[in-house]
Amino acid sequence: MGCCGCGGCGGCGGGCGGGCGSCTTCRCYRVGCCSSCCPCCRGCCGGCCSTPVICCCRRTCCSCGCGCGKGCCQQKGCCQKQCCC
């Protein structure tokens, strides 16, 4: 199916899946860009995805020690309100 970008995020590199019919199936996002149709960017912290992860965090939110790295959460339980004070 190839890859698709979401809004202003541009295209995706090779190796990512998902179709382009809906941004809910787009699995590749670029660092530093986000749009209203990037669902994984809608978390307690906001921010943007660099990999197809559950939730994204700003780097300033990632000092809670709950699995955040390189500006993004690596697991579903990472992005909780208490994590992003």
Swiss-Prot record:
Keywords: Keratin, Repeat. The keyword Repeat applies. GO terms for cellular component: intermediate filament. It comes from the Eukaryota. The keyword Repeat applies. Disulfide bonds: none annotated. Signal peptide: none annotated. Residues 4-69 are annotated as: 10 X 2 AA repeats of CG. In the hair cortex, hair keratin intermediate filaments are embedded in an interfilamentous matrix, consisting of hair keratin-associated proteins (KRTAP), which are essential for the formation of a rigid and resistant hair shaft through their extensive disulfide bond cross-linking with abundant cysteine residues of hair keratins. The matrix proteins include the high-sulfur and high-glycine-tyrosine keratins. Human have a similar number of genes as other primates despite the relative hairlessness of humans. Belongs to the KRTAP type 28 family. This is Small cysteine and glycine repeat-containing protein 5. It comes from Homo sapiens (Human). The gene is SCYGR5.
